[in-house]
Amino acid sequence: MHIFDYDVVVVGAGLAGERAAIEAHRNGANVALISLVQPRQSHSNAAQGGIQCSLDNMGEHSAGDDWKLHFDYTVRGSDWGADQDVVERVTKAAPRIVRELEYWGTPFNRTAEGKIEQRNFGGTTVWRAAFAADFTGHALLYACDQEVMKSGIDIYWRMQVISLILNGDRVIGCIVMDLRSGDLVAFCARSSILATGGAGRIYSESTNAVICRGDGLSIAYNTGLVPLGNMEAIQFHPTGLYPVWILLTEGCRGDGGVLRNKDGHEFMWDYAAKKGNLASRDVVSRSMMSEIRAGRGLEGPFGPHLWLDLTHLGEQKIMSRLRDVHDIARDFAGIDVITQMAPVRPVQHYTMGGIRTDIDARAVGVEGLYAAGECACWDMHGFNRLGGNSLLDTLAAGYYCGSTAAQDAKNRTSQSGDLPAIHSELKKQRGRIEALMSRDPKENAQLIAQEMAEIMTHHVGIFRTGDSLREGIDKLLDLRGRIENVGLKHKKVGRNLELEVALRAPGMIDVALAVAHGAIMRTESRGAHYREDFPKRDDDNWLNRTLAYKQEGDYLPRLDYEKVVITHLPPGDRGYGEKAPPSTTESE
């Protein structure tokens, strides 16, 4: 049995996790960084278009931009679901965060004067997104990873965290399975940070990497003490490349690309008269699905799609600013975007809900646990995230989370008195694995996970109704019961993908149920949560955040609610000139 002892353990080595590890180290903590994959393979690597910050570098296109404008657009974009104290903190910090990443070596695009160049993005009226062509996440992650290596932080990868260690209401570390050997390892920590990314793979059509399965959310939820916030707030990105669902960045439309239907008509102005192709993502995704429902999509073997047209931008602009988009479309769809339109359809993209934390990234309900990035709900994005705010969120949350966790760790005692709790959790997880190994394989975890993902896509998608959600919940509950009968054909614990999936799948269904149950109970439409049977926003009854708690003896979560923090901007019109989608009872 291996037991490691650190001041701070960070689970997840994407941008949020690496930035948290760097800041904890700066504050004097002994830090371990644990990852499923080699850090530079983390999903942050896939972020393309840019990072929002009010630098005002673009002359008339960004004139007068400051944190207040960034704050305003973020709150409006969230459909007043974000905590405004968090939004204020992040938008004020954004220029400093970006300049620090520039200092660390991020190769941002430059203006003729040598300033960091910024591009237009959806849901704003100024050019605010700093970018490195269309591989911004890749560039930022490499810069952060260099800092991690320079700091000498201990990195453990090919490690899957399967549970938290609790002593009463205090998190004292986590149990990790070494995916190469199958050994269980205890990482003890005075402060434990979860930065495990989103849960996109609970959907069958997602831009997310296959590692984005909600691991951090499920192990926090499984404590029964930590709530998941606003899990019904799921973002669908307008331009997933059909039919492989790889992201084509919003920067395509920020740089002048347009969406067209089967007749070649640029339809977005029919739905969002003020912003057109650069309305917020929830508006654009609903508009695209409305076009498809109206029969103006193109039929294909994997369902209907629409067109993203970049052909008028020219080869020089595409190859200098959208090179990855060009290569992705060529390699995965056989499309040359210089001369051909790319087939696209809205697809799951971002988990706006997550582990509920306070403004300093401390998880609600327990001591010693923190969360940052897409797995957290602190709550920067509310019910719709603006493009470019995710990279900012990961870095800002990582900074504050790492600092808070390190400072708190100084005031906590060593783990020597917690050995009984550590041994108890190790024994529990060993028993769980032994049960899977000894059980007859009546059910297959991978097949059940695939069924779950199809249910989520068809019943908890862009357009939602009470009847469809209820049907989806009933199907998910059936799967949750069946998952208890899963057994393994392969009995070796090391390098056993079947075991990895079997350990993860129950938590994935729990997260899916939190999404679906939150959606059926929220009888309004707000941001990305669109109820066709309740199509209007209801500030009188629903200007709040859903909190989902695990219940003993019930697979459905217990729901509670808390008020959203409003400091400067009271609820009002979002300013997109949105036209309501046509009414229909069809489910997506």
Language model features with spans:
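Glycine-rich Rossmann-fold phosphate-binding loop(s) that bind the pyrophosphate
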Residues: 12-15
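Short beta-strand to alpha-helix junction loop
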Residues: 82-92, 128-146, 156, 206-214, ...
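Conserved redox-cofactor binding core of oxidoreductases
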Residues: 97, 102-183, 188, 195, ...
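Glycine-rich active-site loop/strand segments that organize a redox cofactor
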Residues: 53-90
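Glycine-rich loop(s) and the adjacent beta-strand/alpha-helix scaffold that form part
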Residues: 191-246, 278, 300, 387-404
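An anion/pyrophosphate-binding glycine-rich loop and adjacent beta-alpha core
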Residues: 219, 226-336, 343, 404, ...
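Glycine- and aromatic-enriched mobile tails/lids
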Residues: 1-6, 20-23, 27, 38-40, ...
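Short beta-strand "acidic-cap" motif of Rossmann-like dinucleotide-binding folds
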Residues: 30-35, 230
